[in-house]
């Protein structure tokens, strides 16, 4: 007569499986997040190359997409949205081959037409010189970051407005935790923006 498992033995097996899962799952999720961060930085590098190529041909960086300047700008509730389709650097000249580049960490708080649902882009010179010349943020930021900057919401999946002004976002720093507040940025003068930055860690 074969003897089956006792209840205690089954509970021990279940407990062992639970312990192994508790160890493996967080490590898997952390590795997945690190992989997405690497992908974001690679995509930002590709976009940066396209922006610089556009600037060489046109003597200026692309304008911000939410100005509605480009035909075919994507719309949400009748308003142009920045960055869903990179028309300016994909049409009519294809500085990038894929105009549908999306942020792996898309903003989970899409509540208004001007919230970003993919990588954000700032024409820093236009903001500093034409739009907000009296701002305490944009002119110094233009001097620090150069003519443009690109950004991702980062692993916390939201643009973090916790700085001295609503125009500034916290920088993502993996030493604060793989999933921690902060955004991933790349700019003309900073190939991979890392803390510290102007305005007490704001960007």
What are these regions (language model features)?
Residues 2-29:
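N-terminal single-pass transmembrane signal-anchor helix
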Residues 9-16, 53, 148, 171, ...:
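N-terminal hydrophobic or amphipathic segments with adjacent small-residue motifs
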Residues 28-78:
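Conserved hydrophobic/amphipathic alpha-helical signal-anchor segments
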